[in-house]
Amino acid sequence: MMVKFVLVDSASLLSVSDVAFVSCPALNHADKKCGILAFLAPSSLSCCTGSMCCPRNSVDSRRSRWLRPFSLRTVVATSSSGWTSFSVAFSARCFAFCCRRNSSRKATFCVISRVAASESTGSGCGGSLGTRRPTPALGPILMGEPTVPKNVLVRDAGAFGSTRKELMGFLRRWNVNLRWLPRNFAFSLFMAKGCRR
């Protein structure tokens, strides 16, 4: 099954009607799959009680279930040109994984929403990112299990154009269903090296 996923930082995309939670093994990035990392305009998120966090109004207990905590690997683009990488492990309690299946294309669409910037970039929940921190609540995130290669390279969106039209065109070439993206698509687009066609 071809697994492609768009990772966004916006709760506006999520709703009870079209979001389901799936388990991490179904989304193994290291298993010859590629991912597109796209960031949308951030919106307010609220942290759930317990060890998991979720966007507002995104949980339907009849269809969804919380993921068990597991470690994440984040990739921070530290340069606007060329290839560079910086990885750090995050706790799953800082993020919510919301995914749904596009049966016609046999692809999985996934959303990762970051919690409040004070937690995601602080020294508590997310841990320190060293001397280089992403813009609060907008740092690029690479979803996957611990099997994701340690040195994942991320290229800046500038290589694909900076306008909405160019970025949306790039998503279309990757067969991303644009009906799943809100109209306020903006900010940055990242792609893991090795996922090009």
UniProtKB/Swiss-Prot annotation:
The keyword Signal applies. Keywords: Glycoprotein, Secreted, Signal, Virulence. Residues 1-17 form the signal peptide. Its main location: secreted. It is found in: Secreted; Host chloroplast envelope. Belongs to the RxLR effector family. Has the canonical translocation RxLR motif, but lacks the canonical EER motif, which characterizes most oomycete effectors identified so far. This is Secreted RxLR effector protein 86.
